[in-house]
């Protein structure tokens, strides 16, 4: 739940307005974040995956089927259900280990971290060629952002961003932008 709170706080701070965490059981969360057992009908964007752990496949599929912008992160990259939703406009924010899992789930490659790190651009290009609607943001020392045939590299990374929670903040910021249109 901590990762979800971090992402929600970031989304709220970045201007998303009403932010809700979907939980099966009520938890003690900050008062500016709502909680619900289901996704609201007026939801304009979803961030999914942080602290996901073991969620019922039916519930996960129900959320993934919603026709609203999504940013997917963390545990979602280990769930085979994700493959069904890669043909739509979605933002993915994996770190290298999560991207390796995604490559394996999509049958693109079964590689090691070392192989990925040596050929990051190649595997990003392969993935985005097969899934051109996906916006992929591969985290690392130099973040690679790619969609279809376009690829951008952010060379302004910092060791300070390799701390736990920084990816959750990034997911919250992206979901806030998606929610605001």
Can you describe what each PLM-predicted range is?
Residues 1-71, 76-91, 96, 100-181:
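Small-residue (G/A/S/T)-rich helix-start motifs and N-terminal tracts that mark the onset
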